[in-house]
From Swiss-Prot:
<keyword id="KW-0592">Phosphate transport</keyword>
<dbReference type="GO" id="GO:0005886">
    <property type="term" value="C:plasma membrane"/>
</dbReference>
<feature type="binding site">
    <location>
        <begin position="58"/>
        <end position="65"/>
    </location>
    <ligand>
        <name>ATP</name>
    </ligand>
</feature>
<dbReference type="InterPro" id="IPR005670">
    <property type="entry name" value="PstB-like"/>
</dbReference>
<feature type="domain" description="ABC transporter">
    <location>
        <begin position="26"/>
        <end position="267"/>
    </location>
</feature>
<dbReference type="Pfam" id="PF00005">
    <property type="entry name" value="ABC_tran"/>
</dbReference>
<keyword id="KW-1278">Translocase</keyword>
<comment type="similarity">
    <text>Belongs to the ABC transporter superfamily. Phosphate importer (TC 3.A.1.7) family.</text>
</comment>
<keyword id="KW-1003">Cell membrane</keyword>
<dbReference type="GO" id="GO:0035435">
    <property type="term" value="P:phosphate ion transmembrane transport"/>
</dbReference>
<keyword id="KW-0547">Nucleotide-binding</keyword>
<dbReference type="GO" id="GO:0016887">
    <property type="term" value="F:ATP hydrolysis activity"/>
</dbReference>
<keyword id="KW-0813">Transport</keyword>
<keyword id="KW-0472">Membrane</keyword>
<dbReference type="InterPro" id="IPR003439">
    <property type="entry name" value="ABC_transporter-like_ATP-bd"/>
</dbReference>
<dbReference type="InterPro" id="IPR017871">
    <property type="entry name" value="ABC_transporter-like_CS"/>
</dbReference>
<comment type="subunit">
    <text>The complex is composed of two ATP-binding proteins (PstB), two transmembrane proteins (PstC and PstA) and a solute-binding protein (PstS).</text>
</comment>
Length: 272
């Protein structure tokens, strides 16, 4: 039961239920979430390891995207949303009243289900966040564009058309551009909310290979409906059902020998 990381070589999976602080990127403790009178998450506690890919799986409407969006407080945008408990990023509670949400979202980048490039050039899409931060030096911006597009496995395909409109790219290329835009500001964590659900199989495979590369630089958390995808890309997997964390372990355990019957029933297609 070993996974492979190109940087670190073979390593035994961590016990995510007893993860030490120095290997933890995100700590979620006793997290409840309500939308008005409706409760969506129930007493969720878990630790997400840094430098790894963690997947949230579960049936539609189970709360996995809601949980993901707690990490960078995207749920704040939903009227009537109330969160209790804590979500800590490297030990600091992101729900502390002193937290600047814009700064948090620079530290925790996010990519959504459908590619959402801005109606700008490829170049301007990548540097958008840097310009918001006040970066003006052209050499700095140029370097960031190349670095980010290389990180997103897109540089060789677009290096000669950087000033063309991003809408001219294919769907798969647009999604990789969105990933490049997210990593350009060098976040510590990258959240992926079903990033391949709108893509064809070939583009999906490209994104999956990219995710494996990204974990050498970032902590990655992905929501996916596709269990085969979760098994392929994740080091650790959390099964969520009806707003509750049912089981959380290394991916090999979840997909081959889960401890909970609910998990086994979902993995084997008995429900969900």
């Amino acid at each position: 039961m070993y996974s492979f990381n190109d940087t670190l070589g073979y390593h035994a999976p961590l016990d995510v239920n007893n993860l030490p602080d120095d290997k933890t990127a995100i700590t979620i403790e006793n997290l409840d979430l309500h939308y008005g009178q409706s409760q969506a998450l129930y007493d969720i506690s878990m630790r997400i390891p840094k430098g790894r890919v963690t997947a949230f799986i579960g049936p539609s409407g189970c709360g996995k995207s809601t949980l993901l969006r707690c990490i960078n407080r995207m749920n704040d945008l939903v009227e009537g949303c109330k969160v209790t408990g804590s979500v800590k990023l490297y030990g600091s509670n992101v729900y502390d009243p002193s937290v600047d949400v814009a700064t948090l979202r620079r530290r925790v980048g996010m990519v959504f289900q459908r590619p959402n490039p801005f109606p700008k050039s490829i170049y301007e899409n990548v540097v958008y966040g840097l310009r918001l931060q006040g970066v003006k030096n052209s050499r700095t911006l140029d370097d960031a564009v190349e670095r980010s597009l290389r990180s997103a496995a897109l540089w060789d395909e677009v290096k000669d058309r950087l000033h063309e409109n991003a809408f001219g790219l294919s769907g798969g290329q647009q999604q990789r551009l969105v990933i490049a835009r997210a990593v350009a500001i060098e976040p510590e964590v990258l959240l992926l909310d079903e990033p391949t659900s709108a893509l064809d199989p070939i583009s999906t495979l490209t994104i999956e290979e990219l995710i494996n590369d990204l974990k050498t630089q970032y902590t990655v958390v992905i929501v996916t409906h596709n269990m085969q995808q979760a098994a392929r890309v994740s080091d650790y997997t959390a099964f969520i059902h009806m707003g509750k964390l049912i089981e959380y372990s290394d991916a090999d355990t979840i997909f081959t020998s889960p401890m909970k019957k609910q998990t086994e029933d979902y993995i084997t297609g008995r429900y969900g």
